[in-house]
Structures are given as structure tokens and as C-alpha cells.
């Protein structure tokens, strides 16, 4: 979830940014659903998030705080604790894992129907990650499988990405930043 804090600060990330760990919850935050997007690209070994981690970075006009939430089944129930204060969602899909698309669709539907999200016009950025993997689904196919065209009450955008190389991430963050700025006016 992403949010704008008092004083014009907000919270998102992509590889290549310098990160600081923070062990407190800011008033509003950005939930990121993939470890690859929330750690420095210079790291050699990216391991899955266990539970969650909190990271910060700045763009030219906003400061972002990212709650990197584990997508593992046993941790998904933690997501909802961060919905109220968030002002945007980044939902990361492994486009190379065709078998888990059904699970991704179910989790997306659960998220969209949560009382803290359902009636809010909150922007959603989808990262169709691992586009570098052979036989990965295109962002168009991911969009179709997740039925993204059925999302009528929230602005959304999907980007094909390769988080390890940072490809597609700036485009998505730029879109999200524009959406957050629009919400503030």
C-alpha cells in the first residue's frame, strides 16, 4: 500500500535505490508484494520475504515507504493489517509461474473485496515480473487471466518487468506517483 504522509511525503521502490531499514510503521505506507522490488539491485542473492520488511526511498517529488509483504500462503493474512493507511497497492505477479495464476487471482479478489479496500478509489499497480524467463506470460495475458478489465472502480496499470535488471519498474513507479499526486488534489 502506498500513502502520502503529512508534508508531501509518500512511499514505492525499484532496484538500484539505496535502502534504509526502519522498524516502525509510518502513518501511511506502500505494500509491495515481491522481495525483488524492495531490495537493492546490487544484492547478489535475493531471498523471499519472510513476513514483511519495511524499506524507504525517494523519487524526485515523493518519499516512499514500502511494506514488502510475503506472498507465501501462511503470511497472506498479515496483508490486511496494512490496508487502512495505504493509498496505493503494488501487486506483483510471477509471470513465469502459470500454475499459480489461479492463486494470484483468488488473492487479488480477496484483496479487492476487503472492507478497507473495496469502497476506496485506490490505485493498483501490477508488476508482471520475470519477463526475462522463457515462456513467461505476457502482461496482456496476465491481465486477461486476472480479469483486470473487471476492475472498474480503481485506476490500475500493468507493467512487464524484470526486477533483477530493473526493467519496467520506473515506468510503473512513475504511473503510481502520478496517481498519488492526482489523489492529493
Which positions does each model-derived feature cover?
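TRAFAC-class small GTPase G-domain
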Residues: 1-185
